[in-house]
Amino acid sequence: MAFDLAARLAERRAADLYRQRPLLESPQGPEVVVDGQRLLAFCSNDYLGLANHPEVIAAWQAGAERWGVGGGASHLVVGHSTPHHQVEEALAELTGRPRALLFSTGYMANLGAITALVGQGDTVLQDRLNHASLLDGGLLSGARFNRYLHNDPASLASRLDKAVGNTLVVTDGVFSMDGDLADLPALANVARARGAWLMVDDAHGLGTLGAKGGGIVEHFGLGVDDVPVLIGTLGKACGTAGAFVAGSEALIEALVQFARPYIYTTSQPPALACATLKSLELLRRETWRREHLAALIRQFREGAQQLGLQLMDSPTPIQPIVIGDSAQALRLSRLLRERGLLVTAIRPPTVPAGSARLRVTLSAAHSEAQVQLLLNALAECYPQLENADA
């Protein structure tokens, strides 16, 4: 029978890989209502606590009054409004680049940049643990596609030696399921030495890394010559929605001409851009948010290590607890939820087989007391997994 979807779904259920959407019935924040239950959440990417900030909300409301609620058309027709342009200028300033280009989603930004820059006769090389949108962009581009070993400049160099045509090296800045940082200085040196361009998706670094929140490129003290193509998202640390590509004048003009996900879609609501302008202002001005977040990360890592939990090498708000077995990861997530804590279990195919984990994410909106509540609950629940295996 064609399209036997029931069999595919049953197979996924049997492997403990079936996914369901929790229903959020409250604004984003540490304390949420999900499926009718009040919970303390550690699974949002609202890293700076701006998604429900009153000034950001007020900016959106004022933007709707001034500009309406719809983009109305694509950017190249009559959908590129003054707030969109102002956001692009603010993002160029934040990232220290000549220009930036606004996209509706991070997925579209990644697909648009890759497919506009490389095609048949070219080469795209990607880290094995890159986000799905980057991998999809590489496959859709029509270029020769290969993956190098995770965060391994030597592995990249060996593949660059076999590359043909224009060559684009693509990596996450912060790897979303592990929380570790790409070795950008080494990757940039390898790429530049072989005439390749380096593209970095800094979805999880923008706003949280760098003294000014400029992200992983600022964190490492690199520039546009080291990382010609920089991607960032606005739905995480910025607390709103959308994404951007930042780079040279020529890069942005090329994307306007050739990036199909940019050309053939309606622009985001101008009021959303007004909200993003305010969140970018808060990101720059309220440096205490990054400082407080860094303190929470230290607190969690020290406490988790004392409990004997297996963490990954992450200096970021993403703090995965590796469990291994998918069923056990789901069980620990359920045990925590019974105690009023929401921590999501991440399973294959999102992560490699045998590496299921609880993906703890911290926010500047959390308090030290809330992080301690999580550690106390883990101290109570984690040993129950070991007892079940005994």
From Swiss-Prot:
Its cofactor is pyridoxal 5'-phosphate. GO terms for biological process: biotin biosynthetic process. Disulfide bonds: none annotated. Pathway: Cofactor biosynthesis; biotin biosynthesis. Substrate binds at residues 19, 131, 350. It catalyses: 6-carboxyhexanoyl-[ACP] + L-alanine + H(+) = (8S)-8-amino-7-oxononanoate + holo-[ACP] + CO2. Its EC number is 2.3.1.47. SUPFAM superfamilies: PLP-dependent transferases. Signal peptide: none annotated. Pyridoxal 5'-phosphate binds at residues 106-107, 176, 204, 233. Belongs to the class-II pyridoxal-phosphate-dependent aminotransferase family. BioF subfamily. Homodimer. PANTHER family: 8-AMINO-7-OXONONANOATE SYNTHASE, CLASS II AMINOTRANSFERASE/8-AMINO-7-OXONONANOATE SYNTHASE. Catalyzes the decarboxylative condensation of pimeloyl-[acyl-carrier protein] and L-alanine to produce 8-amino-7-oxononanoate (AON), [acyl-carrier protein], and carbon dioxide. This is 8-amino-7-oxononanoate synthase. It comes from Pseudomonas putida (strain ATCC 47054 / DSM 6125 / CFBP 8728 / NCIMB 11950 / KT2440).
